[in-house]
Amino acid sequence: MQKVTVLCVGKLKEKFYMDAAAEYAKRLSRFCKLELVELPEERLPEDPSPAQIEAALLKESAAILAKLPSGAALIALCVEGELRSSEALARRMDAWASQGMGQLAFLIGGSFGL
């Protein structure tokens, strides 16, 4: 069974989202071993400078690398990225599994990206 880790910078705060994440984890448990890892988002002032943002991103990237499962294929998710249907993603995950990628890590960045 494929192991899937979702690394996200920032925490789920609203009960609706926490409940939805739990429901998806339950539904996916038949197909993969799912782990959700929430990493703290670096605190920044209200109007951060580019240097402050860069420093925060470096700290967040260190936290991501520390939690990234060894040997996992890393897939960064982005709002500007390619939209895939559930079926297309399932086919892609099957292809990765066939290629020996038994462990996947999906990454969701914080407010200022990755």
What are these regions (language model features)?
Residues 40-104:
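S-adenosyl-L-methionine/SAH cofactor-binding core of RNA-modifying enzymes
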Residues 29-35:
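A generic structural motif
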Residues 6, 75, 109:
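Conserved RecA-like P-loop NTPase ATPase core
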Residues 39-42, 111-114:
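Mobile beta-alpha loop/short-helix "lid" or hinge segments that flank ligand
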Residues 1-28:
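N-terminal beta1-alpha1 ligand-phosphate binding loop
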Residues 16-17, 85, 114:
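Secondary-structure boundary/capping motif
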Residues 7, 35-37:
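General small-molecule cofactor/ligand-binding pocket signal
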